[in-house]
Amino acid sequence: RIALINENSQAGKNGVIYRELSGVVEPMGHVVDNYGMYSADDEAQLTYVQCGILASLLLSSGAADFVVTGCGTGQGAMIACNSFPNVVCGHVSNPSDAFLFAQVNDGNCVAMPYAQNMDGAVN
């Protein structure tokens, strides 16, 4: 089972992330559980730390085998997740990162930069 967790700065992208992730992994036999945030208007606003706690609880309990999370840069989500037990989270911004992280580090969580290249000319 794959858990999707979004923090508040990127909550508005949850639907797109869930749809794309599910579309790729479900044909391979994986199930994606969406733990939110579901939109920027959610009553409960999840912070990096809360996402890290949730990732740790899901992985430690066996409710999830893998967690996909992220934030604007992916760095804050990665640091928060790695602060809690039983989470080995890598920063993944491209397919090569994902492959090497899985092969070399045997992690159980990835943090993605959901706002990367979103400001175009400013980069």
Residue spans for each PLM region:
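Generic N-terminal amphipathic, Lys/Arg-enriched alpha-helix
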Residues: 1-8, 32-37
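C-terminal binding/interaction regions
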Residues: 3-19, 98-123
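A short, Lys/Arg-enriched amphipathic alpha-helix followed by its capping loop at the start of a domain
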Residues: 17-30
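A short beta-strand-loop structural module common to alpha/beta enzyme folds
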Residues: 28-45
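Short, structured active-site "lid" loops
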Residues: 48-66
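Catalytic alpha/beta core domains of metabolic enzymes, predominantly
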Residues: 56, 70-71, 93-97
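A short, small-residue-rich loop immediately preceding and capping a beta-strand
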Residues: 64-70, 89
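Short Gly/Thr/Asp-enriched flexible loops that form oxyanion-binding sites at enzyme active sites
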Residues: 76-89, 94
